[in-house]
Regions:
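A generic local structural motif
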Residues: 6, 17, 27, 59-60, ...
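An alpha-helical support segment within catalytic cores of ATP-dependent transferases
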Residues: 1-14, 116-173
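ATP-binding pocket architecture of kinase catalytic cores
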Residues: 21-127, 131, 144
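Short secondary-structure junctions
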Residues: 14-22
Length: 173
């Protein structure tokens, strides 16, 4: 009810018809909202600094992704709230991912090639190797019970990075 009230209070609605909770969302809650015959997705979530999740970055990247044609239009945002156009779609299952790799890979390539050119502002980095290093330091500095996996994980990360960097035209430098 608290989330529904938050959604209802947003100043963008003309004739709010329905709010439906959507499954999924690892670090946020998602809702499908019907308003005046159109549908939007409302994402509610806060920053999670220990996991390098900053909602302000989602806004910057969402705008860039929309500009290159791989994401819905950002309709509205405020702290903790992101509203996007709804796109009728189906969540891919592992089998459908495998069956459609020839369509998926070019989209991922486009994301990595074109989004960096469209970014504005100063987004925090969410680069996989930096994140691994960050988590490693976090485990060390907080005397984590998971510290035993740390050195093995760092070694694997360095090996993967080195392999990727050795590939021609690598975009993950």
């Amino acid at each position: 009810m608290e989330f529904e009230n938050k959604i209802k209070s947003l100043p963008i609605w003309k004739n709010l018809e329905n709010i439906e909770h959507l499954e999924g969302g690892i670090t946020n809650l998602n809702f499908l909202v019907s308003d005046s015959g159109s549908k939007s997705v409302v994402r509610l979530g806060s920053d999670i600094p220990e996991h390098l999740v900053y909602r302000s970055n989602e806004i910057i990247v969402s705008e860039a992704a929309y500009q290159i044609g791989v994401s819905p239009k950002l309709i509205y945002n405020e702290p903790g709230v992101l509203v996007l156009e709804f796109i009728e779609s189906k969540t891919l299952e592992p089998k459908t991912v495998r069956e459609n790799l020839n369509k998926i890979v070019p989209i991922i390539r486009k994301i990595h090639d074109e989004i960096p050119n469209k970014l504005s502002g100063q987004p925090q980095i969410f680069w996989v190797f930096y994140v691994i290093k960050y988590y490693s330091n976090y485990l060390l500095n907080n005397n984590s019970s998971h510290i035993f996996i740390n050195s093995k994980f760092i070694k694997k990360s360095r090996k993967v990075r080195k392999t990727l960097l050795s590939k021609r035209n690598c975009i993950w430098s």
